[in-house]
Amino acid sequence: MQKLQTVNAETLLYEPLEKPSFVVDSLIPTGLSLFCGSQKIGKSWLMLKLCLCVSQGIPLWDMPTMEGDVLYLCLEDTFCRIQDRLFRLTDEASGRLQFAVACLKLSDGLIVQLEDYLKDYPDSRLIVIDTLQKVRTASKDNAYASDYGDISLIKDFADRHSLAVIVVHHIRKQNDSDVFNKVSGTTGLTGSADATFVLEKEKRASDTAKLYVTGRDTPYQEYTLRFRDCRWELVERKTQEQLAKETIPDVLFRLVDFMRDKEEWIGTATELLAAMGETETIPTVITKWLNEYRTTFLSENRICYQYSRRKDGRRIALARRAGDSGDGGDSDIRIPPCYCH
């Protein structure tokens, strides 16, 4: 029996370990990524552009790439169709980008095929499998176990060789507030992947789409893309922090301005709204928002919020933290204790 390999906490705490690297900076990590979208949305155009960028070491949407050999398994295409796409995308191509239109199934030896490929191309950085369904075989096993087992074979291969493998897959036609729930199959697929990408249009005929990104080493991001002249162009990129700020009610930004020249403010929610000249927000809502954002947005803007119920009514206490030390402490807050718990 193989002995269990363990690492103690002290070693993990002090030993420098190599961090995951990115084939496309801050976007595509080494390991396994799922790239999902509806049929005919333009996934293959984006994958080809990505492969061209990595093979030539040129940026993708101003993000640096790690140059190296690239293999693109175009399993739903022909070489003629790939050639037509190349004509449209580039005047120059690198010999470091290889294409194949057929390969073995996972159950028949695909991983062995890929291992042999790496012997000839040891400087490989990226492999794209387009699509997942083309390398799978029908299974009578539990759907989750089948999904997890298939994707884990590819992930283990990617991890062994510290390269990025992107598996192209489809999404279901269903409404869901979480786009990642639309990925076809069970959570065994997304659960095993290091990163998941979903490319989605609001309307089929639209030339713009959203690319949603999440992963273990990849922070949540949203990209707005426009498809023009067979290319996906970047319109806007939003990080998790930027998206979080977009959910902050506008009235709280005005509250920060209101408190800018005040040490403290004490009164009811109704009095606060009147003092700010707010007519569109009701007292119960402003009270809820103050509590919801007190440890995030308000704290980041050096505003402390406290709330109390007394015989003479419900009171709100706001105070600006004095100084610019940014230590986040409450030692400078001067709110009368009768209003605080």
Language-model-detected regions and their locations in the chain:
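Hydrophobic positions on the alpha1 helix immediately C-terminal to the Walker A/P-loop
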Residues: 46, 50
